[in-house]
Amino acid sequence: MDKERAGIQSVEVGFSLLEGLTRSRGPLMLKDLASAAGMSAAKAHRYLVSFQRMGLVSQDARTARYDLGPAALKLGLASLARLDAVRLARERLPALQEDIQQTLALAVWGNRGPTIVHWEESHQSVTANLRLGDVMPLLSSATGRCFAAHLAPEVTAGLLQEELADAARRGRHDVPTDLAAAQALLAEVRERGSARVVDTLLPGIVAFCAPVFDAGGHLALAVTTLGSVATFDPAWDGAIDRPLRAMADRLSGDLGYGQG
């Protein structure tokens, strides 16, 4: 019985390292991760060696920093896929794709921002190197703009300030570089019911993103579609935007939004 308790305690201690990486905004050095988990660096290293073998943690060979590994990503995505909102959305995507003939994706808010949790490619050729688990920027992606527009400001404030500073430093003209401009853009997203980018995230790519709300009025997920400017209607309320928003609105209703 004592051994059983010790074994469980050992798992709990090791899990504190995974929690530290989950809360972090990026990869961590050993000493910082150990400190976040409340243990010595030597003790943390022993756990991390095992976690690396299991794929729960990865280490950058160049920087020596630790981050969540592919197995942790798979666990997180599997859990998210079991959420009712994501499951229902996945069931609706084939019909929407048949209607608009474009690539579709689902995103939820993760600990580092809007995260792609499902991806369905169309037969249309799209030069978009996006993968499950990718985190989308708030300002230059339709997905990010949708989340920034509908989440509470305190949730996105840190990431938004970082991206504004980066855009200003780079001298970008296709995204906001100050808070006032960002707020105006996000107000337009809320007014139109969807977010759109053209050539902003990827050259020659257009994307729309529509929000899905739960019964409590909170943003549950976002539905994104993207395609080449050659085959994708970029018009507001056009052949892509309208059915995308309609699908998102129906899904919100099925989740109980607006019925209270």
Where are these regions (language model features)?
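A structural signal for short hydrophobic beta-strand segments in well-ordered beta-sheet cores
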Residues: V57-Q59, L106-A107, V212
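Short glycine-/small-residue motifs
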Residues: L56, I116, L221-V223
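Short, solvent-exposed recognition segments
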Residues: V126-L201
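All-alpha effector-binding/dimerization core of bacterial HTH-type transcriptional repressors
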Residues: L77-S125, H150-P153, L185
